[in-house]
Amino acid sequence: MLGFETIGNATITVFDGEPILVTDPWILGNPYFGSWGHKYKIPQQQLENIKNSKYVWLSHGHPDHTDPDSLNLFADKTFLIADHYGDRIYNDLKKKYNVIKIKNNEWFELSEKIRIKNFADWNQDSTIIIEINRNEIILNLNDR
């Protein structure tokens, strides 16, 4: 499959024959001191696609995006982080995970047919453009 699927308000899984990229995959845990939880069950096939993605892109450092219960499921994956001012998110994640800092406004190739470009703002948040097969564009503004 070449394309994408979504679940929740921030998670996109992108495919190029297999799951290549997942964005902001909060799938376990109850962040914000237990005050947040899922009101839906992620279908098993979507959950497998999320977990099998090669790359994990995180838009910002809020607890629902960096929940340890979810992130630990991706310990063997590569995390992609925008070049945020001060590098707090990058520095925190690289203590435990394989992390690549993506330069702003530059294409980053994930596979033969998938590439991304992200933009960080001054407030430790970011937006991602996902290009599929050089003819489809996805703009993920996540929590905005």
Q: Where are the predicted features?
A:
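Extreme N-terminal starter segment of soluble prokaryotic enzymes
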Residues: 1-5
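Pre-active-site segment of Zn-dependent metallo-hydrolases
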Residues: 18-57, 68-69, 144
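Metal-dependent catalytic neighborhoods of phosphoester/phosphodiester hydrolases
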Residues: 67-76
